[in-house]
A protein has these predicted regions:
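Catalytic-core helical/loop segments in enzymes performing group transfer/polymerization on anionic/lipid-linked
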Residues: 1-176
Length: 176
């Protein structure tokens, strides 16, 4: 069982399927765990480096169990986050990938000797995603490939939601 430190996270459809375990609300007041069911949890989960993630980390450390940081997956939804349920979640038991101030499971994987070459199943999945034109929010129109192939300079605009923790924890600022 996983104790979840946010009612918003508990509202995510199929959360138990994403986490492969039952979930229960880890009701925390003044730093104390008040949930009878959560007292039996083998891990506590919160949202990245937000307050719920910090609560999960603190409770897990006191109880000697794993802390799981959750974040939108790289294929987020069909539509914007406010209007659509997630299609994937990142579950990290080390840190969270966008926080450059501490390690994450992704960082550890990249630094390991483990092969990162996709197997046949991974190659097939990637081919299906490309053929289906799957993107993070799946709301954009078709790419204008002929326009992209025209000679001349191109500008890539990279942006993030104002105030998103990935900017500050990734070493950036609103000016960069």
């Amino acid at each position: 069982m996983i104790g979840v430190t946010s009612k918003g996270i508990l509202a995510i459809p199929y959360l138990e399927a994403f986490l492969h375990r039952p979930v229960v609300h880890a009701n925390v007041h003044f730093g104390q765990l008040w949930s009878v069911g959560a007292a039996k949890a083998s891990a506590f989960a919160g949202w990245g480096r937000r307050a719920s993630g910090q609560r999960a980390k603190s409770i897990a450390a006191r109880r000697g169990v794993a802390a799981l940081m959750l974040e939108d997956g790289f294929v987020r939804s069909y539509g914007t986050a406010a209007r659509a349920a997630p299609l994937s979640l990142v579950v990290d038991d080390v840190g969270i990938y966008y926080d450059s101030t501490t390690a994450s499971a992704l960082e550890n994987l990249l630094a390991s000797d483990q092969s990162l070459v996709p197997d046949e199943q991974g190659e097939a999945l990637l081919a299906d995603m490309v053929a289906s034109k799957i993107s993070k929010y799946n709301v954009g129109g078709q790419w204008d490939e002929p326009a992209l192939r025209r000679p001349g300079k191109k500008v890539l605009v990279v942006d993030q939601t104002a105030g998103d923790l990935s900017v500050a924890l990734g070493g950036g600022s609103p000016d960069t």
